[in-house]
Amino acid sequence: MDFNVSPIVAMITRVNGNEISVIDEITMEGSNTFEMAEELLNRYPDNRLWVYPDASGQARKTSSNTSDHHILRNAGFILKVKSINPPVKDRIAAVNTSLKAVDGSVKLTVDPKCRHLIKCISGQTYKEGTRVPDKNSNLDHMNDALGYL
């Protein structure tokens, strides 16, 4: 999950050994963590859900007495999160390797209904002459969320 106001995004995945299948996605414009938690619970009411969120969600906001992580825990989610996010280049390498490893194996599959994620993966651009994702394209949020997994 990647925390933003526009958009806040989440992917629903199934993990089987080393294989990850993205089976659904949620993109909410002008929203917040409370609403995302509610949407996840509405879509998957009888499932035990683990959330792999952005590590920055542990910080309380000046406008609130709580954090994004606290909101998710209070909603009943199990959080799998490190104290800091891995470096961007490491997350990109991990996702790229999952899409297709050197040996040709594929460890990450994406359901065709996950159109926003597919658009983000295929359309991600980088700042000229760098390996730094271009945040102006607005195609980075789903990719960031995928990298937290």
What are these regions (language model features)?
Residues 17-134:
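Mg2+-dependent endonuclease catalytic cores in nucleic-acid-processing enzymes, primarily RNase H-like
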Residues 1-15:
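Gly/Thr-rich phosphate-binding beta-strand-loop-beta motif of the actin/hexokinase/Hsp70
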Residues 8, 49, 143:
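Residue-level detector of short, conserved catalytic/binding motifs and their immediate flanks
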Residues 135-149:
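Acidic, Mg2+-coordinating catalytic module of metal-dependent nucleases/exonucleases
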Residues 5, 67, 140:
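Short, well-structured alpha-helical interface segments that form or flank functional binding sites
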